[in-house]
Amino acid sequence: MKKKIKYNRILLKISGEFLSSKKTFNINTIFITKLIKQIKLLTNLGVQIGLVIGGGNLFRGSDLEKIGMRRSISDKIGMLSTVMNGLLLHEFMQTANIKSKIFSSTLLEGICERYHIDKAIKCLEKKSVAIFCFGLGIPFFTTDSAACIYGTEIKANILLKATKVDGVYSSDPILNKSAILYKNLSYKDILRKELKVMDYTSLILAYENKLPILVFNMYDPEILYKIIIEKSNIGTLIK
């Protein structure tokens, strides 16, 4: 029997830290291979995927600022890191025979195609994965903010925010074993409880554009499939 698909178009946000490893040139090929396998399964089911990848495994603008760099420059270095990660995933997808196209918010001729909403939509409709790089192209905005903007522009059914824990907790579950996992939250709940999900700019962007967010544990090798076929009790849904 054909599985019922809950989300036909998604925006997947993955932290660059997932790509990092102490082995194999600092690239976590095991994680990437599993991710590509999940993406291929979803595209075969007809799911349209937009992907925003962070750059924290290489450079993080806020960290570079701590060593004396101007934030306007350090953020650009961080944004360039997302381009490198995007190219990495793009190449892995090509090897796996997954159609994909990499877009940049700024002109990077010969490396990425300049982002335009119509081109991105056309890419998705052709069953290609659209990889969005270089954030929003301006400093002081995170890749979470970029994910919310791109998710809104491509009219994604949901923003899937991959994390290393099972969802949103009352406090850090790694430090506090008694932390409570929330299954459903409103955007206002996040702000009122001061929960650490994403920066508030990103959260407000999602709230104003009515973009639901699902926070989940990316280390489950079948998690994207479970989310897409509407398996219950996964992660924390924010709307």
From Swiss-Prot:
Which EC class is the enzyme in?
transferase
Q: Which residues bind ATP?
A: 13-16, 56, 60, 163, 169, 172
The EC number(s) attached to this protein equal 2.7.4.22
Q: Which GO terms describe its molecular function?
A: ATP binding; UMP kinase activity
Question: Sorted alphabetically, which keywords does the UniProt record give?
Answer: ATP-binding, Cytoplasm, Kinase, Nucleotide-binding, Pyrimidine biosynthesis, Transferase
| Activity regulation summary | Inhibited by UTP.
List the Gene3D superfamilies: Acetylglutamate kinase-like
From the UniProt record, give the pathway where this protein acts: Pyrimidine metabolism; CTP biosynthesis via de novo pathway; UDP from UMP (UMPK route): step 1/1
For this protein, the record's CDD domains field holds:
AAK_UMPK-PyrH-Ec (cd04254)
User: Which positions are annotated as binding UMP?
Assistant: 55, 75, 136-143
Q: Answer yes or no on keyword Methyltransferase.
A: no
One Gene Ontology term, aspect cellular component:
cytosol
The principal localisation class reads: cytoplasm
Q: Which reaction does it catalyse?
A: UMP + ATP = UDP + ADP
Where does it live in the cell?
Cytoplasm
Q: One Pfam family from the UniProt entry? A: AA_kinase
Kindly list the biological process annotations in GO that this record carries: 'de novo' CTP biosynthetic process; UDP biosynthetic process
Spell out the family assignment given in the record's similarity comment.
Answer: Belongs to the UMP kinase family.
Q: What does this protein do?
A: Catalyzes the reversible phosphorylation of UMP to UDP.
Name of the protein in question = Uridylate kinase
Source organism of this protein record: Buchnera aphidicola subsp. Cinara cedri (strain Cc)
